[in-house]
C-alpha cells in the first residue's frame, strides 16, 4: 500500500512539473493578453478554446466543429467559413500549434485548416496574414515534445475571394 502511494505521488509530481511547458500555460498567457488588450466586446475564434476562453473574459466562438452548429459545419465544408465567422462577429482568430514558418514569423499568409465534419466534404480554411498578427505568445513544449506557439490575428474583413480591406494602423 505504501509503495502504491509513493508511486502515485511520483506520477503526480512528474505531471505537475511538465505543466509549465505545455499548451495550458500558452493558452493562459494568450487569454490574459486578450483580457488586458482587446475591447470587452471583441469576439475571438479558436479551436481547443476552453482554457483560453476562461482567461480571455471575452466571447469565443469554438472553431473545432464539435460544439458548434450544423450551419457552421456547412460553412466549413462549402468554403464559406470566413463569411460565416465574420457574419457572427468574429474579429480575431487565435491558433496554437502553428507550423514552423509561422512560429518563426517567416510567412506572408497562413491557411489554417479546419476539418469538415460532414461526410465527403472538403476541409475549410481561414487565410491569416502576418501583417494582421496582434499577439505572439511565448513558445511552449507540446505533450509530445514539439515546440509550439500560440498566435492571434485580426481577421481580414474582406469577404472570401475579394481583395483585403485596409485595416488601418
Show where each model-derived region lies.
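Extracytoplasmic
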Residues: 14-38, 43-158
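Signature aromatic-anchored transmembrane alpha helix within multi-pass, membrane-resident enzymes
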Residues: 1-12
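Short, charged low-complexity linker/loop segments at the C-terminal edge of domains
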Residues: 157-167
